[in-house]
Amino acid sequence: MPIIVQKFGGTSVADAPRIHLAARRAVRALLDGNQVVMVVSAMGNTTDRLAQLAYQVSRRPSKRELDMLLATGEQVSVALVAMAIQEAGYEAISLTGAQVGLLTDSAHTTARIQSIDTARIRRLLDQGRIVIVAGFQGVDRDFNITTLGRGGSDTTAVALAAALRAQACEIYTDVDGVYTADPRLVPAARKLERISCDEMLELASRGAQVMHARSIELGKKFGVPIHVQSSLTDSPGTIIMDQAPGMEEVVVRGATLERGLARVTLFGLPNEPGTAAAVFDELAGRALSVDDIAQTVAADGRQVTLSFSVQGHEEGELRAVAELLAQRFHAVHHSINTDLARVSVVGAGMRTHHGVAARMFGALAAEKIRVDNIATSEIVISVLVPAPDAERALQAVHKAFGLDRTTS
């Protein structure tokens, strides 16, 4: 009998009516001849409220105790979902990550899955039960509760689908699929019927909030078909698959916007082996995640200019770090450009089509939008633009590539 894994996010189980709606979806899948595993997030904003409570009690709560606290949110929701299914007359059982055999490393609040023992789940499924698993959590080898970090319930669902060799992993959320852009910012955005794992991974890494990149990576690695659809309607969603049909015929599949970026530039660094390594080692030690790294060498070959982007940090903190780096590594001077946003276009068709960059930059030029940095990869072109121009830039590139017209 085929196995279906269904994941329900916090908004999809935010209250009793939505919990009953999720329960009915699981029962429907069971009656269609499937064995059903549900992965459920904490209700609504429960995780945020629990985190706030922790910081009211302690200025620096232990990560281990944070995991103990945050994991309770999912335990509430899985029990309520099991009750709703039982109320409808069907057998169901709720399990925590530890009870389901989801083993992780010991990196509290950012744990990574090491293995899943599926024996208990399979036994329960063979008994005809719907199994409801708490997302976002696991247990390490010393039986400490761990949590998987941002997007943890998505990761739980895809990992379970892979371990169980499920027919599909269905992600139920408050949107009805993956769009060519955020429809709140681009009213002309269209829903995609299918998208490749590579394209979805890039979109998720660059601001698309439908799914977390880590779960997409798992789906790609283990060949898990992922269906993203609304928990509130029966509208067809989006299928994320290894190779989308006509993948290279569509040049650009989607566009994204990320806010809150800054650009740090160090001028006149000595052009010596190990300089860049030392700079980024210092940044790593301060837990600063950087990207869009660029280095240019001066005409005399003696000095280099090194620049990189940073997201989500206070300007004062960045200035202090930049000054420290400039002093330590003997930079001539440095600059910080804050209040930037990143606009990206993603499409597997870029591999075989020419003129993508020209069309993107032409659209931005027509809107008189300044470009502060350009970064490219095989299927992505990203630009940094002034934050006040960000939405206009997103709308311009979306229109330039016909994403308001193209269905995929």
Describe the residue ranges of each PLM region.
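Conserved dinucleotide-binding and phosphotransfer motif residues
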Residues: 32, 88, 222, 286, ...
